[in-house]
């Protein structure tokens, strides 16, 4: 609350300062400037954001750069209802929109929020944490997108649009240096190769820091970053009808594996024992709480631990995309072709203590090919339509191993390795392959019933064929617990109905119904019970939304608001359960869930040089009917679904005798969240507010800019996730960076 008051105070001061300075300006200089028109492709065609009957937040490349959004994780909180977390340093972000997402970190589980780059669905969670650079825009679509986007978008979608080649020569570069010896350099350049017919753009990223977590055993730093990326793009436009965009991209991350904070939870005294049998709050660092091997972490510093080894999280990505369009006159044919390859090798010290309780190794390779054809109407007649075909092939090879309680091995003549699976002692492995084949046919149309009233209808039929080969073994195949083979076909019909009414040229009302669909499948996590591998069902949602989009004061004030209600059936849920000493993963369907709430976004330009934005979300998200493995979760809140969240920014630019001053202050706030389905209090996090700022100096009409920046200025505790590993006696905290700050230099030509 204090931080929100500070932000409000700064906003008031900024407005007073602008009012004072404007009196010294001429009438022309003081005239407010209208808000920029925002063009989005949420409905697979370029449209004014205010005319699109979908809840969309759009952020330009410049806005992302000013807020230091380096990947999809950094988008968390920047759009109403958007929360993102991870338990890894280089892969597997978990995205939630309006409380809808999947808590599972395994690469075989698709998110409920689809990520798209230049129209291509990024199927692999291994690739969804790739660095952002050289971007034109990012769009966050809230609500099911089952018609035009299809499977795995019951929560929504994130559209990432990269900068395209141009026949006009140009380039830009940005370099930053900050706390933890952080270096970030990114940029791009391009121009014509053969007149206006053929042009290119090459862009890249280098991002490295020493890390913000300390190993007490060695003094070394962890949770570091070391990644680079390169993208080469060509645009061929031989005439006004044909446009072909081709791109190749490489990404590589070789930073350290995640270092979590270990909270000991097994009480060793009656005084420290809580009602649930675990340690009471307030005793975790007292020395009266240990893990399964008796280690007691007595430090409350969430950015340090006793790490036996310092592993690496290596991710290598390759992508090739071809976007081709051909104007046929009354319609345009589009083709989107893509191939993606993602490989990962992650070795992490999961328990964060000097004793060998548990360590993990994750090795994965995922290859995806996809093809989409769309035929869309041109022109501005009363009927506008799009129809298409989609096909995708996805192959995953995954090999996970947990080395559990190796210090308790007792080799004998009869058992030379000392493994004891019955007591969870050994190296437990789960090598698997998962193959998916998907296709869909879809169509959507808009028809103007009158000059002001427009009807929208759409349908999509989807088929997903999946097969799995899964092995559960001990000590790298020395003992095989079971082998499972399964296959199943999932079919679904999703769609959309809507009405949009134009009150005026600057105000629209809309009401929509969407049927969303998330394909069923096979669990690809770690289990010792073959029954857990029975296929889980499709997730479906009936979503109702009403909204208003309006602009006032000669387009100096923009207000968009929406209210929504979701009725979920068979919501896919990831959780953990206890089997012996081992905490194992479990994936199932909740019978029903209910989500409803409201959102609003305000953007204003009250005076020349001053921009204000504010977003708010009020959310109710709970399981209505969910009984699993003997536990009743009905009535519990969904994970990562805060009841209240805000985001906002103030930006001011003002001419100086030499150059221009730029200043920005932005914030995100969310209320309390739970990280598990059981709503366990110790696995929750209180309300958090993060405030960031930037002050800069622009020269030569904005061609050059230098300045200072800070993120998390008040050093708010930055907990991304808390995972209970109760069988081994600890909770693992995944931590985001503390306060960071630095300097930057940008140039363009």
What are these regions (language model features)?
Residues 33-168, 546:
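Acidic, small-polar-rich N-terminal luminal/periplasmic segments of exported/outer-membrane proteins
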Residues 360-377, 420-422, 428, 434, ...:
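Outer membrane beta-barrel strand-and-loop segments of large Gram-negative receptors
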Residues 159, 166-168, 176, 188-284, ...:
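Periplasmic-side early beta-strands and strand-to-turn transitions of outer-membrane beta-barrels
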Residues 1-67, 73-79, 240-241, 320, ...:
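N-terminal Sec signal peptide and the immediately downstream disordered periplasmic leader
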Residues 378, 384-386, 455, 565-567, ...:
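Gram-negative outer-membrane beta-barrel transporters
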Residues 567, 657, 668-676, 697-749:
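C-terminal beta-signal and adjacent terminal beta-strands/loops
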Residues 321-328, 332-348, 502, 508-518, ...:
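Membrane-embedded beta-barrel scaffold of Gram-negative outer-membrane proteins
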Residues 110-112, 124, 133-136, 142, ...:
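Outer-membrane beta-barrel translocator/receptor signature
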């Amino acid at each position: 609350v204090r931080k929100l008051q500070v932000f409000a105070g700064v906003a008031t001061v900024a407005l007073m300062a602008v009012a004072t300075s404007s009196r010294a300006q001429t009438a022309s200089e003081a005239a407010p400037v209208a808000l920029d028109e925002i063009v989005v492709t949420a409905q697979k065609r370029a449209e004014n954001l205010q005319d699109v009957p979908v809840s969309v937040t759009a952020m330009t490349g410049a806005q992302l750069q000013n807020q230091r959004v380096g990947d999809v994780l950094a988008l968390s909180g920047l759009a109403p209802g958007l929360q993102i977390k991870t338990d890894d340093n280089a892969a597997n972000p978990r995205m939630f929109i309006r409380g809808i997402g999947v808590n599972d970190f395994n690469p075989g589980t698709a998110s409920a929020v689809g990520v798209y780059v230049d129209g291509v669905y990024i199927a692999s969670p291994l690739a969804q944490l790739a660095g952002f650079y050289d971007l034109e825009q990012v769009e966050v679509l809230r609500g099911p997108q089952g018609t035009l986007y299809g499977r795995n978008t019951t929560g929504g979608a994130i559209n990432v649009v990269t900068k395209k080649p141009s026949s006009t020569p140009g380039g830009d570069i940005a370099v930053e240096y900050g706390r933890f010896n952080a270096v970030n350099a990114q940029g791009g350049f391009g121009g014509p190769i053969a007149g206006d017919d053929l042009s290119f753009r090459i862009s890249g990223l280098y991002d490295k820091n020493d890390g913000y977590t300390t190993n007490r055993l060695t003094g070394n730093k962890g949770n570091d970053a070391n990644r680079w990326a390169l993208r080469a793009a060509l645009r061929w436009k031989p005439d006004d009808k044909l446009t072909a965009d081709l791109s190749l991209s490489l990404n590589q991350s070789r930073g350290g594996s995640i270092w979590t904070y270990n909270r000991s939870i097994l009480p060793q005294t009656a005084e420290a024992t809580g009602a649930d049998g675990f340690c009471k709050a307030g005793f975790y660092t007292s020395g009266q709480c240990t893990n399964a091997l008796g280690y007691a972490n007595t430090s409350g510093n969430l950015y340090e631990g006793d790490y036996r080894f310092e592993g690496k999280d290596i991710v290598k990505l390759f992508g090739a995309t071809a976007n081709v369009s051909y104007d046929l006159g009354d319609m345009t044919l589009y083709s989107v072709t893509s191939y993606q390859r993602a490989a990962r090798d992650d070795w992490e010290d999961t328990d964060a203590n000097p004793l060998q309780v548990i360590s993990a190794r994750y090795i994965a390779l995922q290859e995806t090919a996809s093809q989409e054809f769309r035929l869309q109407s041109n022109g501005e007649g009363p009927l506008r339509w799009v129809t298409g075909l989609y096909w995708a092939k996805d192959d995953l090879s995954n090999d996970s191993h947990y080395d559990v309680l190796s210090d308790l091995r007792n080799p004998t003549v009869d058992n030379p390795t000392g493994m004891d699976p019955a007591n969870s002692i050994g190296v437990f492995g789960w090598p698997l392959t998962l193959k998916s084949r998907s296709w869909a046919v879809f169509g959507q149309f808009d028809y103007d019933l009158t000059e002001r009233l427009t009807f929208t209808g759409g349908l999509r039929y989807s088929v997903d064929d999946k097969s799995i080969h899964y092995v559960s073994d001990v000590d790298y195949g020395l003992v095989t617990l079971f082998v499972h083979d399964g296959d199943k076909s999932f079919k679904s019909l999703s769609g959309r109905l809507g009405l949009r009414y134009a009150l005026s040229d600057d105000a629209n009302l809309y009401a929509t119904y969407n049927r969303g669909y998330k394909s069923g499948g096979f669990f690809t996590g770690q289990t010792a019970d073959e029954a857990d591998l029975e296929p889980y069902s499709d997730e479906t949602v009936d979503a109702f939304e009403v909204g208003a989009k309006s602009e006032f004061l000669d387009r100096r004030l923009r207000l968009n608001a929406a209210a929504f209600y979701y009725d979920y059936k068979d919501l896919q849920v990831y959780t953990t359960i206890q089997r012996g000493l081992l905490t194992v993963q479990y994936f199932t369907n909740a019978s029903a869930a209910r989500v409803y709430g409201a959102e609003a976004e305000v953007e204003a330009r009250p005076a020349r040089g001053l921009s204000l934005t504010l977003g708010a979300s009020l959310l109710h998200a709970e399981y209505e009917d969910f009984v699993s493995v003997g536990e009743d979760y009905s009535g519990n809140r969904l994970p990562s679904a805060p009841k209240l969240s805000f985001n906002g920014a103030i930006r001011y630019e003002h001419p100086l005798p030499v150059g221009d001053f730029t200043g920005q202050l932005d914030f995100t706030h969310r209320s309390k969240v739970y990280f598990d389905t059981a709503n366990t209090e110790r696995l929750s996090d209180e309300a958090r507010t993060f405030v960031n700022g930037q002050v800069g100096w622009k020269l030569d009409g904005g061609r050059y800019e230098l300045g200072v920046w800070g993120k998390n200025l008040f050093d708010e505790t930055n907990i991304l996730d808390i995972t209970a590993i109760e069988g081994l006696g600890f909770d693992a905290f995944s931590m985001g960076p503390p306060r960071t700050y630095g300097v930057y230099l940008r140039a363009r030509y």
